[in-house]
Structure formats: C-alpha cells, structure tokens
Amino acid sequence: MVEHVDALPRSEDADILSDDFPTNTMPYVISASAGTGKTTQLLQDILLDLLNRNADEAHSSIRESLIITFTVAAAAEIRRRLEQNLQYAILYARRNHGCQPGSLVLLDTDYQLGGDDSELARTILHDCHHAQTVFSVALNDLPTVQISTIDALSKRIVDRNADTLPVTPGFQILADDAMKNRLRGQTLDALFESWYDERNSMHARFMDVLDNMQGPRHDGDLRATMMSLYDKALTKPNRIGWLSRLAEPYRFNIASLNQVVGGEYGNEYLDRYFQGWIDMAEHPLAELRSCLDEALASCHDAHTAQQDTVSLRMICDLPQYLRSESWNAVRARVIDANPLDVLPKRITVGKTAILKSTAIAVPKDSELGRRLAETVRGIKGIVSDLQSKLAFTAEQVDSLDEVAARRLEGLISLITTFDQQYALAKQQESVAEFSDVAFWALDAMQQPDVAKRIGAQWRYIYVDECQDNNALQNRFIREISRNAAKLTMVGDVKQSIYGFRDASPEEFGDICNSVTDASHRRELWVNYRSVPEIITFVNTVFARLMTPNMGATDYLKEQLQIGSAKQAGKPFDAEAIELLVSNAAPDLSADVVADENGTDTAPPVRADKDELQVDMIVRRVQELCEGPHAQYSYGGIAVLARGATHFADLADRLYRVGIPVEVQGVGDLYRQPEIQIALDWLRIISNRHQDVPLVAVLRTMGFTDDDLARIRLHNRGWLFDVMRRIAESGGEADESTVLSSDVLLAKISAFLRIYDAACDYARVHSLSDSLWHLYAVSGLFDFAGNMPEGERRQANLRLLVEKAGAFAVAQERGLQPFLDAVTMWSASGSGEEASTVPTKNAVHIMTIHKSKGLQWPVVILMGASNNLLTGSRTAAVRTIAHQTRNEDGAVAEYGEGALSLVDQRNHVRVDTFQRAVIDSRAKELEAAEELRLLYVAMTRAERKLIIAGSYRPGKNDDGNLNLRTMAQGIALSGDGRTIDPRTVVKNSGSPNYLYWILGSLL
C-alpha cells in the first residue's frame, strides 16, 4: 500500500536565482535579432578566441572549447560550419601570406570571417603563418570537440562520474515521450487504485482534490493536472520544491484588513484584482462626477441638489472606498445599499438623459444629456462587475480560501508521492528521463574534484540560443562555467518560442542587462536576410506590439536595421507584403444549385472558412510559380502555421493540382494506413485468434468480400483456424462441399506461407528485425512506396521500426507488450507522423516552431485569423512564477497557483479572485509567446511575405471586407506609441495574428 509523504515547504527547496556569475566568468553576451547572423558571429568568436589564447606561443587546443546549442540538428550544423570556417581561415591565411591589407589575394566576400576589415581577419593577417598553424591543429582536433545539447552533455558528465551518483548501472534514457508516458501511466494507475481505498491514509485528501475535478468520473483530469505541474517542476532546479508554496496566494485573512486595496498588510493578488477594476472604472466615474458638477453649477437650489445626488456621488467615490474601507464596508455600499436600484430612480437613459431631482433638470437634447446617457450605460456594467467581485462577505471568502489552500496542498502531496513512486519504478526498469540526468549532472558538478576536472577540460564555453533555455538549463550553464576562463552567451529574446517547455527568455534578458562592460556585450541588429520592405513592415508592426511588458523586450531598442547592400538603389516593391484574406461570409446564392434538368443539388463542398483559405493559398502558389510571370520555384515557398490542423488538407489540394509538397509532421503516426497494416500483422502474429485485424490483413492480400464470405460459410470457429483447415484439406469442406475457386485456395495458401515465415522469424529475432522481415515477405514496404506520398509512408514504416527497437531497449521485450504500448500511445495521441523525405523543389509546409532558423524567398503565414490564447480556459490549476527573497538575501523562485472551487455534490463552482489574477497574468504570458511566434514567422521571408486568413464581414459591411472594421477594438496606450498590453490580450473577440497586425498598422 502506498502511504502519504508530506510535501512541507522548506527554505532549501527554493530555486536560488543567483545570476551573479563568478568574476572570472562574467559572460560575454551577443544579443541579436532575426537574420543578423548571430550563429555566424559566434563561430567567428570561437576562431578569434583560439588565435588570441595562442598568441604567446602557449598551446591552447580547441578541445578546451565547449559549444552548447539547443537541438541535435543545430549541434551537427555548427560542427559542419565550424569545419568550413576553419578550412577557409587556413586558405585565407595561406593565400594572403605576406600581402598588405590593401592588396589581398583572397577576399572574404562571403563574410565567413566577418569581412576583410573584421577583427578576426586582421588578427589572421597580422601573422598568417601562426594562424595557419593554429587553425590546422584545430581542424585535426575538431572531431573530438564537445558540441552538443545540454541533455547530451549532462549524459556525458553522469557517465563519467556514475560511481559517485545514485545511478543504476546501464540505465537507458526514456527519449521517446510515448514510452515515458507509459511508465508514468502505470505508476499513476497503481497510485490511484491505492488512493481510492478508504483504508489508505491518503484517501481523504485524494477525494478532496478529486472533488475539485468534479468527482471520480473525471479522475483523468486530475491525472492530467498532476502531470502538467510535475513536468513544469522538472524544469526548475528545485524540482518538486518549486511547488511547495503553490497555495501561498490563499494564505491570508481578508476579514482582518482595514482596507481592500493598498493596505500595509494587504495581499498583492487582492490589490491586482481590484486595481484592475479601479483602472477600468476611474475614467467613466470621473466623467459622471463631471456631469454632476456641471448640472449642479446651473442649479438654483444647490443644497437640495446635493442631497438628491448623494447616492450618485457614492458611486463616483467607489475607488476611494476600496482604498480606505474594509471589504465588508465596501460590500455594504454596493450590495446592501444597491446603487443599481438608485441609479434608475435618479437617471433615466433612453434617447435622452434626464437627471431626476427636485432641484436639477437636464434638458433632453442638451450636450450634457447625451454625455450623461453614454456615461450611465457604461457605469451599470462597472458597478455590476464590482458587485460580483464582492458577492461574498470577507468571512465567506476566507473560508473559501481555506478550502482552496487545502486542496492545493493535497495536490502537492499527491504529486510528491507520485514522484517518489515513479523514481522507484524507473530504478526497477533501469531507465531515466532527461531531467533525471540533468539533476544528476548538477549533483556531480557540486563535488569539488568533478568541478575542478570540468573546469580544466573546458576553459572556453559558448552557448547558442540562450533565450530558449529553462531555469534548470540556465543553472546548468552557471555551474559548468563556474571555473571557466570565458563564457559567451548568444540569444534573441524576441525569438523565444518554447514556452510550452517552460523556456525563460526573461532570464537571458536579465543577464544581458546586467552586463555593463561594453567589451563584454555585442548587439546585432542589421538584418541581411530580408528585403527592406519586409524589414520596414516588421518594424512597424512590432514597434507598437512588443514592449517590456508584452514580449519581454523593448522592440524600439532592438528593431531591425536594413543591411542588404544589394538592395541599394532598387525601387520600392509595393507587392513585397501581401494581405490574403478570404471572405468567410456564407454565399446564400449558392445554398441551392439547380442542374440543367432543374433538379436541386447540394451546396458546394468547399464552403468552410478554413477550406476556402486553403483553396486561396493553393491558387496564390500557382500564380507565383506558374505561367509567363512566374518569379519563384516551388522550393522557394514555405507555408507556415501555428498548428498542423489543416496541413493534410493543404497538402492534398496542392497534390491535386500537381504541385510537389514537403510536409513536416502531419497527422498521427498510428492512424496512417501503412502503420495500421503493419500493426495488424503484428497482432495476428502475437495471437492468430483475432478476426478483426486478420480480416484487415487479408484485404491487403487481395481477399475480396466474396472470398471472405466463402471462407466463413465453409465452417464455424476462428477465421484463422478455418483457413488452416481449408489449406490442409485442399479446399474440401466438412459437408462434402468444395470451394468453387482454385484462386481462393491459392490466396489462402500464399497468406499462410507468409504468416508462418513471419511467426518463425519473430520467435528467434528482435522485434525491430522481425518488422523488417515482415515488410520484406509481405511486400508491405514496397506496397507503401507505390501508394500516393510513398516516400513519406516508407519513412513512417522506418519510424515504427525505430520505436520498436527503442521500446525493447528501454522497456519490455516481446511483441505483446509493444502492442499494448502502441494502443496506449495511439489513445493518448503520442505519435507524430514522420515527415516527408526532403525534396529539392517542393512547397514546404511546417509549423512556425519548426521553421526557426530557416528562410525562404516567399513565406505564407497561414491561419493568421485563427483564435489564440485558449490555454487559460482549460487548465484546472494555473501557476505563475513568484520571486521572493530568503533570509540570507538570496532571491528564490517558487510557483504560486490558483483554482476555481468545485463542489461536485452540490454542482457548485466558485471562481476565486486569485484564479482571475493568475489567469490574467498567464494570458499575458501566452500573448507574449504568440507575439514572438509571429515575429519568427514574419522574419523567415527573404523577398515576399504573405499574411493569409479569413474574415466574416459584419451586417453593415454589405458583404465586403473592410480592414478598419477587422481591426476594430484595439486601442493605443497613453503614450500614443505602443499598444496597451491589456488590449493585446483582451478585446471583443479572441486575439489573432491578423488582429494584431492590422491594429498596429491602423
């Protein structure tokens, strides 16, 4: 039986944010923008450092360099480019040996060294012989240089120090998410079964938390919430300790406060909650006060008028009351003495506004009357909103907060217990997650001898794509560079798009801001990728949208600068930016179509707004690449989108018109027909008495419905056994009947030969080898290759073999365990389909995330009008990071969370103000991430950028598209320069890229 282990908050659980690097490793930072060549600059710095540290004849090998990047593919690309740069630097030094700067034989026209006037080129030319020697040695040593991801580097450190760590010998890493989720699921299954037992000490706490998920029927929601919080905690240096203060927002007493907002002992969540209302209400309430003062100024009986407008002035003073009175006192003003009851008695709002008073009369058609009418309409909603916020007494709110805190504490306990049991399960299976390896590596680097050895091995550390690192990875970088001679960090906060992995772009921004020494800081804003028209457009959009409060950077300080000398003197291209919007209004005239005989037919199939947008994009691609005025090749066009929902439809429509396509990750691997056929083969090999997969396999072998019916009529029992008896009897039936077709008997015999061969092979070979054998004897691999998109389908079959091999190494051996795992992976959607084989001249279709680091002549941003920011509406518990200062003065980070209280028995749901505040902040963070995604998408284009979306015109638009109407609702902040961050998140509809772009332009 699993027992409860309390998760008590401890000071040592804090994530200490000691961003102060040791004096000898104050980082060198390269802060860059898109298309400015930041990785190129990093490679040049590596070569320059290598020359400088060998200047005094002291040998310093390139093996002392450690290069860290974000992905395995990026690491391979850096190694390739570094090899090219070394080869070119050697050639540059050899060809220019003895030359004066003005008469060089070989010019650096491609800027591999940064140009002939760069510091690297000048250093090479200062002593060409020395440069040749240094770079030649470095080129020979390059294969041994550590260029890798943090995950791979952590694994290396752990492997070399395993004897000092709690590591299971021979452990395997759960690199496949599906396999990881399988082991997690098994652990959760066992825990939930024990927690449902009333005798378990965790039962009451478990059921209390489960009640907030609407009861046992929704325990899947609890599992999802636990795993979401668990994954977030694993990106923090303090692991589960990051969750220890999750309930902190609920740990205070409202009834003891003398004032609701701004009190000495107040609560920041309470202040934020009501400050938002004050910010919204102050202007309309000030306008109401102005109207009252104007009316009183012309009144003949001021004393009586003052008496008659007391209740109205009380409404105007509500912000002041929130700052000076207790919760219950303010509540009495807006609930007990309901001003909404008084308001209609004093002011009638219709075509005109009349202030009802014995002493005051406002003319119906006066300017004051119209102002009063407009103001009162808004005030009703404002007062009603405050009433909803103060619906409960302070004592009731405190009671609700106690329940919320208790449930969050219970959730922490459940996650802590899971963490312990999951650790045991991983130990028993001899497996580990990447996060486990990272924490082991951090533990190893805390040991003095290990730290000393690492410091001696890697003296010069270079980190690329720093904006995508999470808190745990940033801690790793600080630890591994503690004894280094130099640390260089490269990144662009504007391109941080991995919030779903809990990336922390703000931390890299803070590091950049902390580096005040100009010699340690370099800024790259000159864009060499895009034409000036695109650069100007991008700057215009993001100068208003991206601010320190929305996007984590001040774009005006980092805006792109035009750097393409090739564009000098060229005329302005008005078509470099296109807005491609499909009219999503229903075409009523096409609802019923009559054929030539007068018979009504169904409306056109392609009528959905997303289908219309796909068709519009297909037509535009044809126009760009076909006909006498074609300027681009298919391979020069990329279609990018936030998600892959409509990729299959787009690829299909492009294929239909003869346009080649390269799609990355479209659809679910386990739903592809070739994979289903392979799995059905495995199922009947594992257990031949499964008629459904057997029939599916037989159909692929050419069996018709008539053939299957004849087999079934032949005898009763399992279909496979019937076929075996038919083959053994030569087609004779038990009742003196024979199969009418020798062809059918031949089909059965051929199938059984293949089946028996596959079974015999599978008994003595590994699962992955058995799959390759099955592909060969059944002809499945060739069959898939001859289907439409054959290369992609064969890639899917290869991926299934890889998954089978990885499963056998990291999990259980055997066919049936693998099939059980596949069933679970398929149900959970854990299988992304393999991409198509890269094609030189094909339209590229991919998500914005996968496009990072790439570029094309033409980029089409698809789905720019799709809704964003849906996450805050689905999560049962939302969290934000909260920094505090410990007793020793160190800054620590914890997670703080909030939820909506649910009473499943009474079917009651109460939204807490803490949840409202955290939801608001979380939506702002989501919006900032989406802004950065939009920036990445728009900066992939070299010559043409096309924004594609759809729009449904309003009733007053006469069915026509109106750009100003499309952008209606977005507002400028008080400085008139940037967009108010709140309007980026909150508007009349759900935010989308098209809304933001048009709002920033109009």
Where are these regions (language model features)?
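Conserved ATP-driven helicase/translocase motor core recognized via long
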Residues: V2-L8, S33, E64, G98-Q100, ...
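Active-site-adjacent bridging/hinge elements
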Residues: L42, D49-L51, A121-H130, R156-D163, ...
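Conserved helicase/translocase P-loop NTPase motor core
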Residues: I147-S154, K180-R184, L411-Y460, Q473, ...
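C-terminal accessory regions
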Residues: G702, R710-H714, K840-V843, S872, ...
